[in-house]
UniProtKB/Swiss-Prot annotation:
Enzyme Commission number(s): 3.5.99.6
InterPro entries: Glc/Gal-6P_isomerase, Glucosamine6P_isomerase, Glucosamine6P_isomerase_CS, NagB/RpiA_transferase-like
GO BP terms: carbohydrate metabolic process; glucosamine catabolic process; N-acetylglucosamine catabolic process; N-acetylneuraminate catabolic process
HAMAP family linked to this entry: GlcN6P_deamin (MF_01241)
Oligomer and partners: Homohexamer.
Protein name: Glucosamine-6-phosphate deaminase
Active-site feature positions: 72, 141, 143, 148
Length: 267
């Protein structure tokens, strides 16, 4: 596992956006051979999306031959709802770049058969071979996507009941009313994420420090689903200084020295 300990949120955004752009450009995608990118929602990746849009506008990358798969979507929330993840992605990213509509994949939380929708999503991913790079965030309790604590570390895309902690955390998007937050979501599984060729997780803020400590220094544990990254061959965690507060000093020192060139690449 790589850990890139940066100073602040802006550096995390710039570094992660540049990493994605470099991966796309190295791949040299075409219509017949697209680059497949996994994407998250939430507050953490917002600045990364802003940085990606800036790089696109500067002519440094095209998303025309990039296929995207989002991590999750609420059940029962119309696509047009301002807090649906469909709305989030178009507002904060898709509407600002040259991605083709046909290449955008987001789970549909309004079908009559959720299991069939989840199976369809898995098969759609497999039809492209694999996801080349999956970017994600992490919850305060260490969850990735909506794989809440005690999720199977080999799980696939499925419907999940959201925990009280997640409902409370997400209520800030629903007028701070926990009763307005959907109780269920469709989400990729931990196993689905681990199938990606490369996984990059963004961790920012003091409130994510325990999750980062579990991911880097803890043992693999289904109560902290982020720890599953330890089993991945090409996992990267990009974090800011506040998120490292629970890590041992020698751990931060080790990765700071190991990733010195990567850290110097962003200002």
């Amino acid at each position: 596992m790589r850990l890139i300990p940066l100073h602040n949120v802006d550096q995390v955004a710039k570094w992660s956006a540049r990493y994605i752009v470099d991966r796309i450009n190295q791949f040299q995608p075409t219509e017949a051979r697209p680059f497949v990118l996994g994407l998250p929602t939430g507050g953490t990746p917002l600045k990364t999306y802003e940085a990606l849009i800036e790089l696109y506008k500067a002519g440094e990358v095209s998303f025309k031959h990039v296929v995207t798969f989002n991590m999750d979507e609420y059940v029962g929330l119309p696509k047009e709802h301002p807090e649906s993840y469909h709305s989030f992605m178009y507002k904060n990213f898709f509407d600002h770049v040259d991605i083709q509509e046909k290449n955008i994949n987001i789970l549909n939380g309004n079908t009559e058969d959720h299991d069939a929708e989840c199976q369809r999503y898995e098969e759609k991913i497999k039809s492209y071979g694999k996801i080349h790079l999956f970017m994600g965030g992490v919850g305060v309790d260490g969850h990735i996507a909506f794989n809440e604590p005690a999720s199977s570390l080999s799980s696939r895309t499925r419907i999940k009941t959201l925990t009280e902690d997640t409902l409370i955390a997400n209520s800030r998007f629903f007028d701070n009313d926990v009763n307005k937050v959907p109780k269920y979501a469709l989400t990729i599984g931990v196993g689905t994420l681990l199938d990606a060729e490369e996984v990059m997780i963004l961790v920012t803020g003091y409130n994510k420090a325990q999750a980062l400590q579990a991911a880097v220094e803890g043992s693999i544990n289904h109560l902290w689903t982020v720890t599953a990254l330890q089993m991945h061959r090409r996992a990267i965690i990009v974090c800011d200084e506040p998120a490292t507060q629970e890590l041992k000093v020698k751990t931060v020192k080790y990765f700071t020295e190991l990733e010195a060139s990567a850290i110097r690449s962003v200002k």
